[in-house]
Amino acid sequence: FFQAEDGIRDTSVTGVQTCALPIYSQMHPKKGLRHSPISGVVLTNGDVDHVAGLLTLRERQNLSVYAHSRVHSVLKENSIFNVLNSDYVDRREMKMNVEFELKNKEGKGSGIFVEAFEVPGKIALWLEDESKGANFGTQEGDTIGLKISSASNEKSFYYIPACAKMTSELSEKLKDSELVLFDGTLWKNDEMASSKVGEKTGQRMGHMNNSGPDGSIEAFKDLNVKKKIFIHINTTNPILLSDSSERKIVEENNWEVSYDGMEITI
């Protein structure tokens, strides 16, 4: 979340490494060369593409970082994250299934409320330990989703950038919701191998595929979600191509494909 000109009330749901780039006018410095309007960050897992951008948010600007205790412990154990000077950066633990208001370093409320919850997934790639069996040492809190609401609770949406499967508990949570931003990593489970860019399947990486009977398109069919948008999309995924047959299938099933700078109103 970041400081808009008329208050701390805006959210960006891109990866932290993207948030740190000056691609949106709202994120440009407002008070000098080193000012950052970014007031805080919420982490949903410890993967590199979710935490690496923290290293660019270290220019002695006040910041609050929210995460599960599991992810905070990972950051604490890796000394490179000590560049986040504790004089300026508050590391705040998120309790699961408890709604709270996002606040800046000084404790000023943002008017944005978040409820974090666990979703099926796995440990961050760089923390995997093959000696610990099929789950590679996955622990509680390694993968979470967020429900993000306005202060009045009149509007809310879900942000789930990684999800290994749709459970009955998760489908019940998402049912009849206004907006869901969901893991769109791969079209097919074996996409990395068939594209000759890697060997791991989507399931091995902790991601549902979009297509097929066990895919996210099928999983959402009866959930009556008003607006569904794929995020966290791998470069191999053909839904990125506006003229592909896969994109056509996505759109026929009332899904949208996210893009840089996308703005959504609910």
Which residues does each predicted region cover?
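Single conserved hydrophobic/aromatic residue that forms the stacking wall/gate
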Residues: F1-C19
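Active-site metal-binding loops of divalent metal-dependent hydrolases
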Residues: S12, V16, G46, V119-I123, ...
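Metallo-beta-lactamase
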Residues: P37-D49, H68-I144, A151, W255-D260, I264
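Short active-site oxyanion
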Residues: S39-G40, R60-S64, S156-F157, K227
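Histidine-anchored nucleotide/phosphate-binding helix
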Residues: V51-R58, S216-I217
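Short internal beta-strands
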Residues: L63-H72, L181-D183, F230-I231
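Cap/insert and terminal regions of metallo-dependent hydrolase folds
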Residues: G141-T143, A151-S156, A164-M262
